Amino acid sequence: PIEQIAKTAGSITEGRDLTRRIGLSRGSDEALRLAGSFDHMFERLEHSFETEKQFASDASHELTPPTAVILAQCSYIGKYAGTEEEYLEGVAVIERQAQKMSLLINRLLDMTRLEFGTRKLAKEDTDVSLLVETLCEEQDTGARGISLERDIKKQLHAQADAHLLSRAVMNLLENARKYGHDNGHIRVKLYDNGDNLILEVEDDGIGIAPEHQDKIWRRFYQVNSSRQAGSGLGLGLSMVRQIVRLHDGDIRVNSRPDAGSCFTVILPKGEKPVL
């Protein structure tokens, strides 16, 4: 058994195959426990490498377009900008792209921390009603004539990480705003069904075809070019599901093309800690 453990560990150390496991089925109790511990460590190691590869791939894919725009603008300013106005316009474009890159990097880091488990939940008694109400008030929907309708029951509390929960709700609201129609409607509903709080965010926008609904939770997944309009970051729904699951909750979508989407979050209220 020890030779088998050493051989597998050596193979992984040399980087040949991170999927290998010892899989010891016979031996002393001590050897079986040792092999099991090694296999668990190998699983975590493989997951870490895969997450790192995914992060590098995602970052490369999403940072390339704004980087290209910045380089092109720098070249244009250096060669052709002759007036102060042209310089300022070029600098403004560079600033917008740099801000986009900064936002992307921060969201990627947040996602990676959540997946690695290095971002621990800081649960506390949270007034979810107030949290959702505040985020709704902060939404800028006026420019496109979108009306935001609210049906939020008061004084609904849950044991939650308020910062992460705010991020999840904000992402859902932004998603509804970006993919809703001009002069359309967003409806936000929050209520208590017993053990859980239920949050519904509904729009009457472009909707999602059934064959895409299981895929929208993937990082950077885009259904089509029209859904890519806007920030283009494609991290919102993936992060929402990650945050909801960290709270032992669930999220579902009900949608039809050209008929809008309704995202439903099921958030356990949890038990208040005994003081």
Model-derived regions, located:
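Short alpha-helical segment of the dimerization/phosphotransfer core of two-component systems
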Residues: 96-101
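Membrane-proximal HAMP signal-relay module
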Residues: 1-56, 68-83, 92, 113, ...
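Short beta-strand/loop element within the Bergerat-fold HATPase_c
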Residues: 183-195
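Short helix-loop "hinge" at the ATP-lid/N-box region of the Bergerat-fold HATPase_c
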Residues: 176-177
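Conserved catalytic submotifs in the C-terminal HATPase_c
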Residues: 23-25, 122-125, 147-157
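Acidic ATP/Mg2+-coordinating residue in the GHKL
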Residues: 203
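Short helix N-cap motif at coil->helix boundaries in the Bergerat
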Residues: 128, 207-218
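Glycine-rich GHKL/ HATPase_c ATP-binding element in histidine kinases
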Residues: 259-261
